[in-house]
Design a protein with these regions (language model features):
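P-loop (Walker A) phosphate-binding loop of NTP-binding proteins
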Residues: 10
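Conserved substrate/cofactor phosphate-moiety recognition/catalytic segment
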Residues: 20-66
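Hydrophobic anchor at the beta1->P-loop junction of P-loop NTPases
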Residues: 7
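Glycine-rich phosphate-binding loop used to anchor ATP phosphates in small-molecule kinases
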Residues: 52-94
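Conserved phosphate-donor/acceptor-positioning beta-strand/loop module used by diverse small-molecule
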Residues: 93-112
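Walker A/P-loop
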Residues: 16
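Small-molecule kinase domains that catalyze NTP-dependent phosphoryl transfer to phosphate-bearing small molecules
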Residues: 115-157
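ATP-binding Walker
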Residues: 13
């Protein structure tokens, strides 16, 4: 049975790091769909309403449903802007969606950003512009992840939640 893990939250919250660790934990054949890779690297478009990444992300979620046991969708993925992706995911995966929202204070995300390899690409000003406080989705039933949880704990919690349902 196919499962979808959705990791959402503001820039610098640890989504990509957790997605990569989950991919290693689940093993080969686990599909990671990174909003940054699709939007910034593949299409090179701004994150604005109706951007070209939305249908491609949707198509990749569909591909994951058809070809991967576990698909991980990660990114800022603003709740209002990416509703189309979430709605299609809900149609495909039903109750096999494990959605998490990294609900961290801005200062924590800024601190974490300073440890990233791409820290020189953008800074505090851009992160403040992109910031959305508690941007939970109406479509996804998201479990909050707070600053007190460490990466290993997050990975194991999600891994066991998915395996328990398998």
């Amino acid at each position: 049975m196919a499962a979808l893990i959705v990791l959402r939250g503001n820039s610098g919250s640890g989504k990509t790091t957790v997605a990569k660790a989950l991919q290693r934990r689940f093993g080969r054949g686990t599909l990671v769909i990174s909003q940054d890779d699709v939007r910034r690297n593949m299409l090179w478009v701004h994150d604005e309403p109706g951007n070209a990444a939305i249908p491609l992300l949707t198509a990749l979620v569909e591909y994951g449903h058809a070809h991967a046991d576990v698909t991980i969708l990660e990114g800022i993925l603003y709740a209002d802007r990416y509703q189309e992706v979430f709605a299609r995911a809900r149609q495909l995966y039903g109750t096999e969606i494990f959605a998490y929202y990294f609900d961290l204070p801005f200062e924590e995300t800024l601190e974490r950003h300073q440890t990233k390899p791409n820290r020189g690409e953008f800074g505090e000003e851009a992160m403040r512009r992109w910031w959305r406080e508690r941007d939970y989705s109406d479509i996804l039933e998201e479990t909050p992840i707070g600053r007190e949880m460490k990466r290993e704990e997050i990975v194991e919690t999600i891994f066991h939640a998915v395996r328990k349902n398998a």
